[in-house]
Curated annotation (Swiss-Prot):
Its main location: endoplasmic reticulum. Phylloquinone binds at residues 142, 146. This is Vitamin K epoxide reductase complex subunit 1-like protein 1. Induction: Up-regulated in response to oxidative stress induced by hydrogen peroxide treatment.
Length: 176
């Protein structure tokens, strides 16, 4: 017996628009965060636009040891290891992945989107803890990316539920 063929299912328009907006914002913030970190490495006195006061300093957080490889990969792979990249590089890859995989309605893509979103929220919670309790800083760029990651988790969960319902309807026997 042949496996059932699923018809093409598309996601709601609001999901595509929301995903595009969140990913575009995430990509732009990741690029800016990368720029801030590079400038801070080049010139330790560099003052970024997001450095608004003594307690609101994104450059301090981005240039800290937790700003590269989540503060973990450097001790595993070495400070100059290829995987010990700025967190903004991982963010850029994540948002591009979310954008590209969001263009397809496949089950595998939906699972990858959901899994990577869960990982990003766990990473965001870890970095938020470091930001508040260890660095004692307020990084507006960091906080906004944490919110974007949480929004993507919600979008991906809604997508998974929507696609699951659509596929179940397709597999139900037709009543004459």
């Amino acid at each position: 017996m042949a496996a059932p063929v699923l018809l093409r299912v598309s996601v709601p328009r609001w999901e595509r628009v929301a995903r595009y907006a969140v990913c575009a914002a995430g990509i732009l913030l990741s690029i800016y965060a990368y720029h801030v970190e590079r400038e801070k490495e080049r010139d330790p006195e560099h003052r970024a636009l997001c450095d608004l006061g003594p307690w609101v300093k994104c450059s301090a957080a981005l240039a800290s040891r937790w700003g590269r490889g989540f503060g973990l990969l450097g001790s595993i792979f070495g400070k100059d290891g290829v995987l010990n990249q700025p967190n903004s590089v991982f963010g850029l890859i994540f948002y591009i992945l979310q954008l590209l995989l969001g263009m397809t309605a496949s089950a595998v893509a939906a699972l990858i989107l959901m899994t990577s979103s869960i990982m990003s929220v766990v990473g965001s919670l870890y970095l938020a803890y470091i930001l508040y309790f260890v660095l004692k800083e307020f990084c507006i760029i960091c906080i906004v990316t944490y919110v974007l990651n949480f929004l993507l988790l919600i979008i991906n969960y809604k997508r998974l539920v929507y696609l699951n319902e659509a596929w179940k309807r397709q597999l139900q026997p037709k009543q004459d």
